[in-house]
Amino acid sequence: MKTKTTYLLLLFLFQISFAQVEYGTPSNKDIPEKLQNLDIEIEVKHFPKENDPIKIKDKYYWKHATAILSKKGDVKIIEFGAYLFYNNTWNLRKSYNLKDLDNNFGTKKQIMLQGEPYVWSKNWRIDNRLFGGWAMWYFIGINHNGDTICGYETINTTSNLLNK
């Protein structure tokens, strides 16, 4: 009986923890702390910016592309990743291995050449659950003057299934 009660209590607490997540919508002022004091010199663009999913078999796909560009000079990327917005704040989802930048965006040794766009054409979100939310991709680099700079952009993934 004690084991069953403990099990039910744990199950209840587990369900409550998921129910308490509030996804919400970030304001333009909501920026992760690590980016707040850095100059923005890397352009980041998502297409489409509002991303509706399609369902293929038992998975949902939010298909989009992400592009990065430096207009002021060459940039050495030293960190990149993604945040998710929930509970009224940006939460780090993942910082990626720098080799992933070369593989996915086509840079060489994480160097962005001035005026050269780099595009990850299959930067897709895939999940077995259908839910929307906000993500922010960020890039931190060192510019030609040795300054640490950044770029970031949000993307809204919706729960508006296209192929119902």
What kind of region is each of these model predictions?
Residues 1-2:
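N-terminal secretory signal peptides that target proteins for export/translocation
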Residues 5-15:
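Sec-dependent N-terminal signal peptides
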Residues 32-41:
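Proline/serine/threonine-rich low-complexity linkers at boundaries of modular beta-sandwich domains
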Residues 47-48, 57-65, 135:
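Short, solvent-exposed loop/turn segments enriched in Ser/Thr/Gly
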Residues 69-112:
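The feature marks short-to-medium sequence segments in extracytoplasmic or secretory-pathway proteins
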Residues 100-136:
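Short, solvent-exposed, Trp/other aromatic-anchored flexible loops in extracytoplasmic proteins
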Residues 127-164:
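Terminal connector regions
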